[in-house]
């Protein structure tokens, strides 16, 4: 069987030119049927081309279905002009074949409308669950971003980086362990309570910093309860710097 890549379609141009001129439509079909008329023309066309073109029209039709639809419609139009056949069931079949081959790509590429998505009762719970999941993920990331960039976390991290005890335990270049650190705990400055911890790493080891502070009295005075660094089972206390650094506003 000859592949479609090696098939030269220009070899059939004289055949279609002959069809247009009417040289191949010399014998009328014995029955007034569009399908038999097309078959008669196909047979006569094969006889007309068998000496000059080794590939018959029937094998060419099997190679390319899309081109077959267009050629059959062309035969149908020529038969109607030559013999005056009426459009019957075969004509409707050829028309459907031609429309299916031409309009398939447009139907596949069409995006569904918003009403079609929302009208399906099965898709509504899935879309609602996906929306809730996306909203929850964005909310958690936003809260963690706020904790990471809060003045409490930045001041405590500054104290750890400049602490002599922390440098002896972790080494130099102390920073957050991950590019986007996870800061669990409570950071409620308005309610007067802070209890957070985050992971840090240096050139020698890594550890966990825990900070806890609470506000007492009507003057809104913050009291630091805990500020420690734990690494490899060893816990050290981070010294307090300037007193105003522990008064959170």
Curated annotation (Swiss-Prot):
TM region positions: 124-144
UniProt-listed InterPro entries: Coa1, Coa1_fungi
Location within or outside the cell: Mitochondrion inner membrane
Main location group: mitochondrion
Signal peptide segment: none
GO cellular component term of the entry, any: mitochondrial inner membrane
Record flagged with keyword Glycosyltransferase: no
Membrane-side (Mitochondrial intermembrane) residue stretches: 145-249
Ranges of the Mitochondrial matrix topological domain: 1-123
Keyword annotations from UniProtKB, A to Z: Membrane, Mitochondrion, Mitochondrion inner membrane, Transmembrane, Transmembrane helix
GO biological process: mitochondrial cytochrome c oxidase assembly
Keyword Ribosomal protein in annotation: no
Membrane topology: Single-pass membrane protein
Pfam families attached to this UniProt entry: Coa1
Protein function: Required for efficient assembly of cytochrome c oxidase in the mitochondrial inner membrane. Involved in a step coupling MSS51-dependent cotranslational insertion of COX1 to the addition of its heme A and copper B cofactors.
Record-stated family: Belongs to the COA1 family.
Protein name: Cytochrome c oxidase assembly factor 1
């Amino acid at each position: 069987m000859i592949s479609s890549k090696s098939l030269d379609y220009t070899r059939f141009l004289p055949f279609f030119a002959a069809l247009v001129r009417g040289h191949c439509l010399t014998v009328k079909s014995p029955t007034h049927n569009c399908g038999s008329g097309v078959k008669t023309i196909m047979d006569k066309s094969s006889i007309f081309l068998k000496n000059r073109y080794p590939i018959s029209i029937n094998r060419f039709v099997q190679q390319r279905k899309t081109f077959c639809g267009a050629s059959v419609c062309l035969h149908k139009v020529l038969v109607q002009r030559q013999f005056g056949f009426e459009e019957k069931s075969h004509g409707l079949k050829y028309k459907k074949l031609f429309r299916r081959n031409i309009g398939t790509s447009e139907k596949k590429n069409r995006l569904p409308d918003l009403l079609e998505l929302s009208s399906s009762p099965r898709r509504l719970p899935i879309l609602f669950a996906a929306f809730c999941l996306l909203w929850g993920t964005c909310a958690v990331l936003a809260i963690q971003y706020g904790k990471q960039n809060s003045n409490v976390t930045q001041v405590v991290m500054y104290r750890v980086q400049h602490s002599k005890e922390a440098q002896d335990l972790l080494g130099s270049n102390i920073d957050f362990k991950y590019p986007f650190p996870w800061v669990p705990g409570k950071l409620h400055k308005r309610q007067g309570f802070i209890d957070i911890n985050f992971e840090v790493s240096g050139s020698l080891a890594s550890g966990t910093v825990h900070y806890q502070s609470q506000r007492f009295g009507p003057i809104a005075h913050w009291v630091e309860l805990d500020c420690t660094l734990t690494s490899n089972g060893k816990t050290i206390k981070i010294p307090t710097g300037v007193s105003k650094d522990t008064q959170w506003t």
